[in-house]
Design a protein with these regions (language model features):
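Cys-dependent protein tyrosine phosphatase-like superfamily
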Residues: 1-160, 173-175
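Ser/Thr-glycine-rich phosphate-binding loops at phosphate-binding pockets of nucleotides
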Residues: 165, 169-170
Length: 175
């Protein structure tokens, strides 16, 4: 089902935002991503209305890749989508490889990670600098993005990948 006519067009839902069609973008070699095969978004738990559930089902998703931590997805579980296989692989990892948890209980761990980063560089750092360092490493050696590419290479489409807000972890996957 073709739902958008321009690359990155937002698909409107009553309960969720930043849900986008990724068809239409051009690759470096000039080829174009096909419409109706690749979607990105935020927390699906916000989809409450029958209209939202019907719209999501109309995309014909075969795969949903949840990039949130176990804590985030347990606190706000995805709704079942008919015909779609669900898998969760956290899109952000701590230095030791464990899941970076953005739920309430994970915030203290994030503070500890930042302090460890400050010790490693020998000075206090601004949050922007710390997150920039995380984002530079995020796409590499990350099981979440390996899972996304495996779905695409296996032609398990249409696929939706998402996190809590559909910006950071999801944005890296969209690049």
């Amino acid at each position: 089902m073709q739902v958008a006519f321009s690359p990155g067009a937002e698909i409107k839902f009553e309960g969720a935002n930043n849900f986008r069609e990724l068809g239409g973008y051009r690759a470096a070699d000039g080829r174009q991503v096909k419409y109706g095969l690749l979607y990105r978004g935020g927390n699906l738990d916000l989809l409450k209305s029958e209209a939202d559930h019907a719209r999501l089902a109309s995309l014909g998703l075969r795969e949903i890749l949840d990039l949130r931590s176990a804590g985030e997805s347990a606190a706000h579980p995805d709704p079942a989508v008919p015909g779609a296989h669900y898998q969760r692989v956290c899109g952000m990892r701590n230095v030791d490889g464990t899941e970076m948890d953005f739920s309430g209980q994970g915030i203290e761990r994030l503070r500890q990670e930042k302090k460890a980063f400050e010790r490693s560089v020998g000075r206090p750092v601004h949050d922007f600098e710390w997150f920039s360092a995380l984002y530079r490493e995020m796409p590499f050696r990350n099981p979440a993005y390996h899972a996304l590419f495996a779905l695409l290479e296996g032609r398990r489409v249409p696929v939706l990948f998402h996190c809590s807000c559909g910006k950071d972890r999801t944005g890296i996957g969209a690049m």
